[in-house]
Amino acid sequence: MVARLTTLLVCLVFSLATLVQRGYGDFDDFNLEDALKETSSVKQSHFSTTTRRTGTTRAPANPAERWDHMTTTTTKRPGTTRAPSNPLELDGFDLEDALDDRNDLDGPKKPSTGEGGGLSDKDLEDILGGGGYKPDKNKGGGGGYGSQDDPGSGAVTDPGTIAGLVSALAAALLGAVSGYLSYQHRKFCFSVQRGLDAAYVKGENLEAVVCEEPRVEAAMCEAPPVTDSTQHSQPTEPLAPERPRI
């Protein structure tokens, strides 16, 4: 039983070593005799004669070299050479070109003949040089300011402005008319209410007069009581009727 387990263990170790060798390559310190040495002591107890293989010399194992398979290499980016920049050469830009008439796009300018025109390089030189600026005579036709340049001088008006003014006036007129109508309506309502109140008060007064007239007539028909001393001396006089109360 022990021999079978030992044989099975040897087979497993051998297969594992084969897989490791395929995955990582051959190692200098790997040898199958290591597995045979572990089982030699067990085999001596079952077999009378054992044959041992001659030992082979091995190089000392370095465990650090087993896993040192990945090597990294870094490459530097080659430097690029650039042309030296000259700050003075910016597309040939120079402020002196503004004073030179020969490098203009429309060609050299013709000298002014005194018939219209605007400012020229000569005028700028006179201003910068300290000399008084004296505009040329008869130059009112070219660069002068006319009434046609003023957008507000014409008689044409924006139609949006006219529409806004008309709408504002219409709204104001409509508001005034509606306010006047509401005032007249309220005034008429108050006058009608006053007439109704006056008629109501007058009707109440008439009812009071009608109710009081029978009492006055009854008082006039009744005679005052006569005492014994004045029964034969003074005749009885009817009482004056009372005025109706309003």
From Swiss-Prot:
Residues 26-160 are extracellular. Keywords: Cell adhesion, Cell junction, Cell membrane, Glycoprotein, Membrane, Proteoglycan, Secreted, Signal, Transmembrane, Transmembrane helix. Its main location: membrane. Residues 1-25 form the signal peptide. The chain crosses the membrane at residues 161-181. Residues 49-58, 71-81 have a biased composition (Low complexity). Glycans are attached at S153. O-glycosylated. It is a single-pass type I membrane protein. Pfam families: CD99L2. Residues 43-156, 223-246 are annotated as: Disordered. GO terms for biological process: cell adhesion; diapedesis; positive regulation of neutrophil extravasation; positive regulation of T cell extravasation. Residues 182-246 are cytoplasmic. PANTHER family: CD99 ANTIGEN-LIKE PROTEIN 2, CD99/MIC2 PROTEIN RELATED. Belongs to the CD99 family. Plays a role in a late step of leukocyte extravasation helping cells to overcome the endothelial basement membrane. Acts at the same site as, but independently of, PECAM1. Homophilic adhesion molecule, but these interactions may not be required for cell aggregation. This is CD99 antigen-like protein 2. It comes from Rattus norvegicus (Rat). The gene is Cd99l2.
